[in-house]
UniProtKB/Swiss-Prot annotation:
Taxonomy of the source species: Bacteria, Pseudomonadati, Pseudomonadota, Alphaproteobacteria, Rickettsiales
GO cellular component term, pick one: cytosolic small ribosomal subunit
NCBIfam families: PRK00132.1
Key words, A-Z: Ribonucleoprotein, Ribosomal protein
GO molecular function, one term: RNA binding
Native source species: Rickettsia rickettsii (strain Sheila Smith)
Name assigned to this protein: Small ribosomal subunit protein uS9
Biological process per Gene Ontology, one example term: translation
Pfam families in the cross-refs: Ribosomal_S9
Family: Belongs to the universal ribosomal protein uS9 family.
Length: 159
């Protein structure tokens, strides 16, 4: 029993000390005041620069409406701004390569969310709750030899 008393006293002393102040890591901000982040989805990789502006979004030197013809893609990309209520407050420039349109959309969404998190740490809880900061790690399963596809096998005949 005396050992437990000593341990609890040590813990109490540590708790009464001043709380540790965690140093925030230096965020990726370039000399022009832009927040930089990378987003990934499937085989697509997006590099995103975010700066305070009027809500202009450029993807591979095209407007977002030109690059993504479907309106639903544009709405999902704007989801981080809707959650954080910052529509038309930031300008975005991003370059995307690899994958298809859906993968590129997911990569841009992930990159924008990460850049918003760096711009204002208050958004972290909101974006985390919306599931926008977690990387979707699902990728295409490889084709196996002796099979038609990744999971599909050749037709089996008993006799």
């Amino acid at each position: 029993m005396p050992e437990l008393k000593i341990k609890t006293e040590k813990v109490e002393k540590q708790l009464t000390k001043e709380p540790l102040v965690l140093k925030t890591p230096k965020e990726k901000i370039d000399n022009l005041g832009k927040f930089y982040a990378t987003g990934k989805r499937k085989n697509a990789i997006a590099r995103v620069w975010l700066k305070v502006g009027k809500g202009k979004i450029v993807v591979n030197k095209k407007t977002i409406a030109q690059y993504f013809p479907s309106e639903t893609y544009v709405k999902t990309i704007l989801q981080p701004f809707v959650l954080t209520k910052t529509i038309d407050q930031y300008d975005i420039i991003c370059t995307v390569r690899g994958g298809g349109i859906s993968g590129q959309k997911g990569a841009i969404l992930h990159g924008i969310s990460k850049a918003l998190d760096k711009s204002a740490p208050d958004f972290r809880a909101i974006l985390r709750k919306g599931g926008l900061l977690t990387r979707d790690s699902r990728v295409v399963e490889r084709k196996k030899y002796g099979q038609r596809k990744a999971r599909k096998k050749t037709q089996f005949s008993k006799r």
